[in-house]
């Protein structure tokens, strides 16, 4: 037998190298076969519910890193809730209707207008479902646990029927109406857009300053006076029907030198405008408040048959322009509101493709709206005072990336104004994990207009509205429920397969249809109404879920999207918010903090991360960042996270290896019988348990990451395990001192594995497979540990906190000696301490082998003053000398008792005692040379 074989060198097959890219799919397959998700739900039946409702990603293309961050975050929360005693089923979902899928088919060469509509919609459906399957595999590869066999998909018949019933309840309450209000209109999509489908970019536009001649000054202005207007949308002048001034703004009538005309501008802007127009020696003839100009009549700049009325509006400012704006009720929300209030004509001169129509006049008809500025300038003639190109923030279609316009078209609206206060009151009851999120959603609801819910597209859920022969819309409770039942049985495709009369209840009549003829609406619903109905289609309709949901967790862009639409529909139907809590996340940026873009080549695909590092590293990264704000990710950042993972893994591997001969039932030592240092580590670990339990409950992932990394690297690796080798390797295998330490090792190993499970389920299960004494087959079927408290806990913590300070001072002294070449490793040291009374009391309280704790071979606690040249740190003096004696071949300490024993072993007395008591045969036969 060799001497080194008498050491308890921990042995384990648990590999140092994780091999995550290859192992993770194997684990995932095993979990599927074992039906782990279903077994976890069965374990928690009857326990308090926690429902995280999944916001549906759009089914188009592979997932990106933002998807991964969101789904992993949800998975961590659901897993932690399940292990904390909650019934927390997770139903993943997908949003499957809308323009992007139509655009993909168009790029693939599908010509919608050449196909039968039903055939086209089936192609859309097939494509959407193929994308659902693609993304499902992507999400499962991340280790996300959920009811993947029964997800919700917005195109399924049951979901579409639930959506129709949400609409029906809103219609019953009078919240659905038809109007010709201006809406965001995308000429590139040929459809109206919701606010959530708008994004802003800088756009260079031609701005014009021009004048309208006064026709009837109402005794205030003369007819040789011109009111000066500013616009950044020249095409809208074709539909201008009024001029709007601010009631409380001061306006001046001026006459520049050499001009026969008089002009009206805002007093505050006169100087800047005079410079812009080249006016000199401007004479101010009169000053009027805006309200005094109300109802003055002017003439359209070129269509002299059209009068433009001066009206008052709160939206007019003196921040730019002239303090006067022209008003085209067909091309703007503010224009529409003040125009309708003053009986102005709602006139629209642009068609659905952005082309000027015949009613714009022969000079404009057929031109693209954005190209008419030269024609407008020509038509204005000497009424044009100035023109310039300006760059300003402008709304774009978020899908096509093309600018949009405001355009009044007949649309279906969901009222927000009728129950706005009810929505705002519900926001106050929701718990927001960021106060700014609450303010943002509150302000959006407070300031938003009614919701245009109709879309002039094909792929979506039809609006369940019929029309009588006289054009009267029909949407009664009876007709809507009948449509819902048809959708439930056949899917919404039935709307396009059948005639209107075959979609109505049998025998249905209406006074507006004396001949019994009906037509049906051909518009579909805004896709935000689709996903915004998920609280009904999923949370209400699935028996395992409870409404309202406990948590909605999505990106911060969803304050204007899913959070918003879900809130409106839920309050409209039931008077309550669909969620009790909202947690939002920022965006994933590249390593430099730049937005990720395929064109910039700075995107990171989750699949690439999985191939290089494994999904565990992506999961750990999610906890390493504050995702409530924008976060950074790059392969370099992931390499750093991978290194942290390696440290955690190797530390836990050490614990596995050094508890391989430990049976917790037979070998565990009661807390009361532990050494002081072991009690300290037990208490510190339970503080960690408490911190992590609270952080899981509060969704504070970064707190968990920092706490675990700190405990593993500082408390374990840099302290407890650093000196542990001198005990677990060297002491007799069944000695009390070794079993004391193994008791702590095993407790930490089992519980920290459970704590890590929601974040690193693959690694946790791999560790668990080595813990043969644990009852649960899978760690995912266990519970999170509860934090314990212990007698004299604070006193023990105070003692060891003080010792850690002392240890730090001692390490400085050893480092100094190492630099001076007095010693090499710390085990070569004889450390003499000249303590003050506080330290002397402390070392007595520690009641441990201090030399062992400091990893030195010899320690002397000296009396009296320290010699000259001693190293002093914070009133404690140290002298470091090389230890006396020889190196023990077994424990590697330098000791004066080391000698060659009769059994061919150069060992110290302590090791000799262990050998003679535990290895009698080897002692009698003599040890082999190493």
Swiss-Prot record:
HAMAP family associated with the record: Ile_tRNA_synth_type1
Q: What is written in the cofactor note of this entry?
A: Binds 1 zinc ion per subunit.
Q: What is this protein called?
A: Isoleucine--tRNA ligase
Q: Where on the tree of life does the source sit, at the highest rank?
A: Bacteria
Name the positions where Zn(2+) binds: 888, 891, 908, 911
Q: Cellular component terms, GO, for this chain's entry?
A: cytosol
Which EC main class describes this enzyme? ligase
Q: Specify which residues bind ATP according to the UniProt entry for this protein.
A: 598
The subunit structure is: Monomer.
> Where's it found, cell-wise?
Cytoplasm
What InterPro entries does this protein map onto? Answer: aa-tRNA-synth_I_CS, aa-tRNA-synth_Ia, Anticodon_Ile_BEm, Ile-tRNA-ligase, Ile-tRNA-ligase_type1, Ile-tRNA_ligase, M/V/L/I-tRNA-synth_anticd-bd, Rossmann-like_a/b/a_fold
């Amino acid at each position: 037998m060799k001497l080194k074989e008498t050491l308890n060198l921990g042995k384990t097959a648990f590999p140092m190298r994780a091999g995550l890219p290859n192992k993770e799919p194997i684990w995932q397959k095993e979990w599927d076969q074992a039906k782990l998700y279903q077994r976890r739900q069965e374990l928690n039946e009857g326990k308090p519910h926690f429902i995280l409702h999944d916001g549906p990603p759009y089914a188009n293309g592979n997932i990106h890193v933002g998807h991964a961050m969101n789904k992993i975050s949800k998975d961590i929360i659901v897993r932690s809730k399940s292990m904390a005693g909650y019934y927390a089923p997770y139903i993943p979902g997908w949003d499957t209707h809308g323009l992007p899928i139509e655009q993909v088919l168009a790029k693939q060469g599908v010509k919608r207008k050449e196909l039968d509509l039903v055939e086209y919609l089936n192609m859309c459906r097939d494509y959407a479902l193929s994308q659902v399957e693609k993304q499902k595999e992507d999400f499962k590869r991340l280790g996300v646990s959920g009811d993947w066999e029964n997800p919700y998909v917005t195109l399924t018949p049951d979901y579409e029927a639930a959506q129709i019933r949400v609409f029906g309840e809103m219609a019953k309450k009078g919240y659905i109406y038809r109007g010709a209000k201006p809406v965001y209109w995308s000429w590139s999509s040929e459809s109206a857009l919701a606010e959530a489908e708008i994004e802003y970019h800088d756009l260079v536009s031609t701005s014009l300053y021009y004048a309208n001649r006064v026709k009837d000054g109402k005794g205030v202005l003369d007819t040789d006076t011109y009111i000066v207007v500013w616009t950044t949308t020249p095409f809208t002048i074709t539909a201008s029907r009024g001029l709007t001034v601010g009631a409380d703004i001061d306006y001046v009538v001026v006459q520049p030198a050499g001009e026969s005309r008089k002009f009206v501008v805002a007093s505050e802007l006169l100087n800047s405008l005079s410079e812009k127009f080249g006016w000199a020696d401007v004479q101010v003839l009169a000053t009027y408040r805006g309200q005094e100009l109300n109802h003055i009549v002017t003439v359209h700049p070129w269509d002299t048959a059209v009068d433009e009325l001066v009206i008052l509006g709160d939206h007019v400012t003196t921040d730019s322009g002239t303090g006067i704006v022209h008003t085209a009720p067909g091309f703007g929300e503010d224009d529409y509101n003040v125009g309708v209030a003053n009986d102005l004509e709602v006139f629209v001169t642009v068609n659905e493709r952005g082309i000027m129509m015949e009613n714009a006049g022969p000079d404009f008809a057929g031109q693209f709206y954005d190209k008419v500025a030269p024609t407008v300038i020509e038509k204005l003639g000497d009424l044009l005072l100035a023109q310039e190109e300006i760059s300003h923030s402008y709304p774009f279609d978020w899908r096509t990336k093309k600018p949009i316009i405001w355009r009044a078209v007949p649309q279906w609206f969901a009222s927000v104004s009728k129950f706005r206060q009810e929505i705002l009151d519900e926001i106050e009851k929701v718990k927001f994990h960021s106060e700014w999120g609450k303010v943002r959603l509150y302000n959006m609801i407070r300031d938003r207009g009614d919701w245009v819910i109709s879309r002039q597209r094909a792929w979506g859920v039809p609006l369940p509205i019929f029309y009588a022969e006289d054009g009267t819309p029909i949407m009664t409770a009876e007709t809507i429920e009948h449509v819902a039942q048809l959708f439930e049985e056949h899917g919404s495709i039935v709307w396009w397969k059948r005639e209107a009369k075959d979609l109505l209840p049998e025998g249905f009549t209406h006074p507006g249809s004396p001949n019994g003829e009906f037509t049906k609406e051909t518009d579909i619903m805004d896709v935000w109404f689709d996903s915004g109905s998920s609280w009904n289609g999923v949370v209400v309709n699935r028996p395992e879920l409870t409404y309202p949901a406990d948590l909605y967790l999505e990106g911060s862009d969803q304050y204007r999207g899913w959070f918003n639409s879900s809130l409106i529909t839920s309050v409209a139907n039931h008077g309550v918010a669909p969620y009790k809590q909202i947690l939002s996340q920022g965006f994933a940026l590249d390593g430099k903090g730049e937005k990720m873009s395929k064109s910039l080549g700075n995107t990171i695909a989750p699949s690439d991360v999985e191939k290089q590092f494994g999904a565990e590293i992506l999961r750990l990264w999610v906890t390493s960042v504050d995702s409530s704000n924008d976060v950074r990710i790059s392969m370099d950042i992931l390499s750093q996270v991978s290194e942290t993972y390696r440290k955690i893994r190797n530390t836990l591997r050490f614990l596995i290896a050094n508890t391989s001969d430990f049976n917790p039932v037979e070998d565990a030592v009661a807390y009361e019988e532990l050494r002081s240092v072991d009690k300290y580590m037990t208490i510190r670990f339970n503080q960690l348990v408490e911190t992590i339990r609270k952080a899981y409950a509060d969704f504070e992932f970064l707190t968990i990451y920092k706490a675990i990394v700190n405990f593993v690297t500082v408390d374990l690796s840099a302290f407890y395990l650093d000196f542990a080798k001198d005990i677990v390797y060297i002491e007799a295998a069944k000695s009390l001192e070794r079993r004391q330490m193994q008791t702590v090792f095993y407790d930490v190993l089992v519980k920290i594995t459970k704590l890590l499970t929601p974040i690193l389920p693959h690694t946790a299960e791999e560790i668990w497979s080595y813990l043969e004494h644990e009852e649960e087959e899978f760690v995912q079927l266990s519970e999170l540990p509860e934090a314990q408290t212990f007698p004299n806990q604070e006193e023990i913590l105070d003692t060891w906190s003080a010792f850690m300070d002392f240890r730090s001072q001692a390490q400085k002294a050893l480092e100094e000696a190492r630099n001076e070449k007095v010693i090499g490793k710390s085990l070569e040291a004889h450390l003499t301490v000249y303590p003050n009374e506080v330290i002397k009391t402390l070392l007595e309280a520690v009641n441990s082998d201090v030399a062992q704790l400091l990893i030195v071979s010899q320690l002397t606690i000296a009396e009296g003053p320290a010699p000259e040249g001693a190293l002093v740190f914070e009133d404690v003096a140290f002298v470091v000398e090389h230890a006396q004696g020889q190196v023990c071949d077994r424990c590697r300490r330098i000791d004066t008792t080391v000698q060659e024993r009769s059994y061919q072993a150069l060992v110290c007395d302590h090791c000799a005692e262990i050998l003679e008591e535990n290895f009698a045969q080897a002692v009698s036969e003599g040890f082999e040379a190493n």
